[in-house]
Amino acid sequence: MDVVDELIKLHEEHVSGLLRLCGQAGWPDYGEQELKLLVQQGRFFGYQNVSGDIISCIGLFLFGRLTSIGLVIVDKEYQRLGLGRRMVNACITQTDENTAIRLCATKEGLPLYEKAGFHTAGSVRKYSCHSFQPYTKKLDAELTSFREQDFHDLTAADLAAFGGDRSNLLQQLISASCECIIARNQDGQLIGYGLSVQTPANLKFGPIIAPSSDVAAQIITRLAAGKQGPMRIDIPSEHTSLHDSLIEMGFHKDDEPPILFYQKKAPIQNGHLYALISQALG
């Protein structure tokens, strides 16, 4: 096949090629703006053919002691040439041995990742909704709109829940979000937050950080209030109590891909991560 045998770094000028690959992979939530943000926040690599077309890509997102690998795509015309394996191995070499590496695998990619040294450590449940029903249980948590002075406490809550420092990414996401909601307890302490972002395909909820599934459901209801059209949320599978609340709110489960970590290294998390930014970013 006419592949240029050099893994190159991808930049903003390659976004159109990334957009084509995402379309081919059936990932409609990644539009031009979403991909530009990801390229700015992460390290992207890929292969070209001799015509200069991007025929594969991979994203590496560094969050301190936790790294995410995502958007691993190989053009269907160039599969089974070992490009995916070479891209994954290249990303692994970009991190040190003390860093946990996570990724969300497709069924097709799972054997590749397992051969590279990844192991399954849970799963992500993808939910969608076309007719939202508000969560009616009353709670003591107070919900307010985000203000700049909340950012320090928000990032501290996110670090404890996610296990990696996403402060730079969160600054960009909050600026691009439809809404950012803060949850506080009766003492006024920040105990959680949630974001909604409009993608080309859905109104997406995430990340959502909360001390309980009830507070997470309350944040989702606030973010969805008055909104129309398709909605999506991706939650870690261990939060089974939120599953029932999502069903009551009109969501249904579409898929449950596995989460993998490299060489049994996993971050320290406090269990408060109720929804991901995306499967690529965690």
UniProtKB/Swiss-Prot annotation:
Task: Say which enzyme class the record assigns.
Answer: transferase
- Which UniProt keywords are present, listed alphabetically? Acyltransferase, Transferase
Q: Where is the N-acetyltransferase domain?
A: 5-140
Checking InterPro entries in the record gives: Acyl/Acetyltrans_Enzymes, Acyl_CoA_acyltransferase, GNAT_dom, YitH/HolE_GNAT
Q: Name one GO molecular function term.
A: acyltransferase activity, transferring groups other than amino-acyl groups
Q: What is its EC number?
A: 2.3.1.-
Pfam families listed in its UniProt record? Acetyltransf_10, Acetyltransf_18
Q: Which domain of life is it from?
A: Bacteria
Instruction: Give the protein family.
Output: Belongs to the acetyltransferase family.
Give the protein's recorded name.
Uncharacterized N-acetyltransferase YitH
